[in-house]
């Protein structure tokens, strides 16, 4: 397979300094809204990157579940590889690849655990099947066969057939406190537009970066 000639032009539009609000979350909200309106597949899907104790990076796709000026939120099994890595190294990066809109957003920050109340509010809002799945899977542990996982799910489905399902102690969320957020818009002749918001005490410094 020849990869050298796989490329395309970027022509959907540019991004100017005058277009940028002082708060980066406002621009992110606009771009996410436009991604949803464009009917992109999984517009809230983001790549979450963490590192282990040896500095080895790991990435996976996770769904964004909430965001505001205080940070970006996702949920996971607290025994998962990403959660265990965040216990040791709280630095994290997020990446939203909205290719059809010729846009990317890259976020760096620090992860902190959500409160038990925040976890409960989201967990109880999930479909019952998703709640049971959270109990059934010991995320990132080794499995002998898929049948073992499916059997555990069916066992728990019967156990929790009636009444509310409690929040597992090994399940919860993280809020990513933003250190920086970069907005990338594809441009003509590979002259892409990149703007970096960097946290400067209680304000944001905005810089244009070379593509």
Swiss-Prot record:
<dbReference type="InterPro" id="IPR019576">
    <property type="entry name" value="Pyridoxamine_oxidase_dimer_C"/>
</dbReference>
<feature type="binding site">
    <location>
        <position position="130"/>
    </location>
    <ligand>
        <name>substrate</name>
    </ligand>
</feature>
<dbReference type="InterPro" id="IPR012349">
    <property type="entry name" value="Split_barrel_FMN-bd"/>
</dbReference>
<feature type="binding site">
    <location>
        <position position="126"/>
    </location>
    <ligand>
        <name>substrate</name>
    </ligand>
</feature>
<dbReference type="GO" id="GO:0004733">
    <property type="term" value="F:pyridoxamine phosphate oxidase activity"/>
</dbReference>
<dbReference type="GO" id="GO:0010181">
    <property type="term" value="F:FMN binding"/>
</dbReference>
<comment type="similarity">
    <text>Belongs to the pyridoxamine 5'-phosphate oxidase family.</text>
</comment>
<feature type="binding site">
    <location>
        <position position="122"/>
    </location>
    <ligand>
        <name>substrate</name>
    </ligand>
</feature>
<dbReference type="Pfam" id="PF10590">
    <property type="entry name" value="PNP_phzG_C"/>
</dbReference>
<comment type="pathway">
    <text>Cofactor metabolism; pyridoxal 5'-phosphate salvage; pyridoxal 5'-phosphate from pyridoxine 5'-phosphate: step 1/1.</text>
</comment>
<feature type="binding site">
    <location>
        <position position="194"/>
    </location>
    <ligand>
        <name>FMN</name>
    </ligand>
</feature>
<keyword id="KW-0288">FMN</keyword>
<comment type="function">
    <text>Catalyzes the oxidation of either pyridoxine 5'-phosphate (PNP) or pyridoxamine 5'-phosphate (PMP) into pyridoxal 5'-phosphate (PLP).</text>
</comment>
<feature type="binding site">
    <location>
        <begin position="75"/>
        <end position="76"/>
    </location>
    <ligand>
        <name>FMN</name>
    </ligand>
</feature>
<dbReference type="InterPro" id="IPR000659">
    <property type="entry name" value="Pyridox_Oxase"/>
</dbReference>
<feature type="binding site">
    <location>
        <position position="81"/>
    </location>
    <ligand>
        <name>FMN</name>
    </ligand>
</feature>
<feature type="binding site">
    <location>
        <position position="82"/>
    </location>
    <ligand>
        <name>FMN</name>
    </ligand>
</feature>
<feature type="binding site">
    <location>
        <begin position="190"/>
        <end position="192"/>
    </location>
    <ligand>
        <name>substrate</name>
    </ligand>
</feature>
<feature type="binding site">
    <location>
        <position position="65"/>
    </location>
    <ligand>
        <name>substrate</name>
    </ligand>
</feature>
<keyword id="KW-0285">Flavoprotein</keyword>
<protein>
    <recommendedName>
        <fullName>Pyridoxine/pyridoxamine 5'-phosphate oxidase</fullName>
        <ecNumber>1.4.3.5</ecNumber>
    </recommendedName>
</protein>
<feature type="binding site">
    <location>
        <position position="184"/>
    </location>
    <ligand>
        <name>FMN</name>
    </ligand>
</feature>
<keyword id="KW-0560">Oxidoreductase</keyword>
<feature type="binding site">
    <location>
        <position position="104"/>
    </location>
    <ligand>
        <name>FMN</name>
    </ligand>
</feature>
<dbReference type="InterPro" id="IPR011576">
    <property type="entry name" value="Pyridox_Oxase_N"/>
</dbReference>
<dbReference type="Pfam" id="PF01243">
    <property type="entry name" value="PNPOx_N"/>
</dbReference>
<feature type="binding site">
    <location>
        <begin position="139"/>
        <end position="140"/>
    </location>
    <ligand>
        <name>FMN</name>
    </ligand>
</feature>
<feature type="binding site">
    <location>
        <begin position="60"/>
        <end position="65"/>
    </location>
    <ligand>
        <name>FMN</name>
    </ligand>
</feature>
<comment type="subunit">
    <text>Homodimer.</text>
</comment>
<keyword id="KW-0664">Pyridoxine biosynthesis</keyword>
<feature type="binding site">
    <location>
        <begin position="7"/>
        <end position="10"/>
    </location>
    <ligand>
        <name>substrate</name>
    </ligand>
</feature>
<dbReference type="InterPro" id="IPR019740">
    <property type="entry name" value="Pyridox_Oxase_CS"/>
</dbReference>
<dbReference type="GO" id="GO:0008615">
    <property type="term" value="P:pyridoxine biosynthetic process"/>
</dbReference>
<comment type="pathway">
    <text>Cofactor metabolism; pyridoxal 5'-phosphate salvage; pyridoxal 5'-phosphate from pyridoxamine 5'-phosphate: step 1/1.</text>
</comment>
